[in-house]
């Protein structure tokens, strides 16, 4: 006799926006009964699956902060049900944010002409952006598509945040080293409230003692001060700001430019080399 196949159904209660609040909807999941995707590439998750994804990606990204795929998964797993809706609502309440949601622009090498950006005058936003890309050895095509956010519009909001991240780097001048990433993520947390950006602060534990001290004394106060004081950076239509003066845009947004971290690190290395050379000379 063929054994009966037992199917276990998990009922998930998820928050959906409704008017000025949220309503809870029940959704049945099983290995044989998964809802269809809401947009290309969408992967619906149960509450248990989302929790496992959040925990696993958090641990993995802490062990290896350079794993962008894990950081992206952590961002999506922890953004719902509230935080990504808050960010979407911030866009809806702003005229430029509403235009972005309507136009759905994407940032990639197909939508931005890198050669044109290199031709712009120094200190324009576009020239600053491409100069930062060249200096850090990265490109605009490294952002993975959103998969785990159920609401299609909110998925775009997360994609937009993700693709604008390098503009945040460029406008602040922070490099892609772990110290710079943690500083920028702290700024983003104060500005966007996305949990992943706040959780990224745990990567401070992986910094060297001197870097950790520099974060607490220099980067953290700057990030909180600028993140809270500045306008919502998700509402910047970067594609329309490329020819503007970068200092003018920073002033308009209320972003204080931090100390040049790469120059600080170079200075510290030179100082350490000089001290070691002096010790070696004294030992002769």
From Swiss-Prot:
GO CC annotations? extrinsic component of mitochondrial inner membrane
Keywords (A to Z) from UniProt: Lyase, Membrane, Metal-binding, Mitochondrion, Mitochondrion inner membrane, Ubiquinone biosynthesis, Zinc
> GO:BP terms for this protein?
ubiquinone biosynthetic process
Topology relative to the membrane: Peripheral membrane protein
Catalytic reactions on record: a 4-hydroxy-3-methoxy-5-(all-trans-polyprenyl)benzoate + H(+) = a 2-methoxy-6-(all-trans-polyprenyl)phenol + CO2
Predominant subcellular localization, coarse grouping = mitochondrion
**What top-level class of enzyme does the UniProt entry assign?**
lyase
Enumerate the subcellular locations listed in this protein's record, separating them with semicolons.
Mitochondrion inner membrane
Residues bound to Zn(2+):
165-166, 169, 181
* Database matches in Pfam families: Coq4 (PF05019)
State if Hydrolase is listed as a keyword.
no
Give the highest taxon in the source lineage.
Answer: Eukaryota
Quote the EC number. Answer: 4.1.1.130
Matching InterPro entries: Coq4, Coq4_euk
Q: Which cofactor does it need?
A: Zn(2+)
Associated pathway: Cofactor biosynthesis; ubiquinone biosynthesis
Q: Does the keyword Zinc apply?
A: yes
Q: What does this protein do?
A: Lyase that catalyzes the C1-decarboxylation of 4-hydroxy-3-methoxy-5-(all-trans-polyprenyl)benzoic acid into 2-methoxy-6-(all-trans-polyprenyl)phenol during ubiquinone biosynthesis.
A further note on this protein reads:
This protein may be expected to contain an N-terminal transit peptide but none has been predicted.
Subunit structure and binding partners = Component of a multi-subunit COQ enzyme complex, composed of at least COQ3, COQ4, COQ5, COQ6, COQ7 and COQ9.
Family the entry assigns: Belongs to the COQ4 family.
Protein name per UniProt: Ubiquinone biosynthesis protein COQ4, mitochondrial
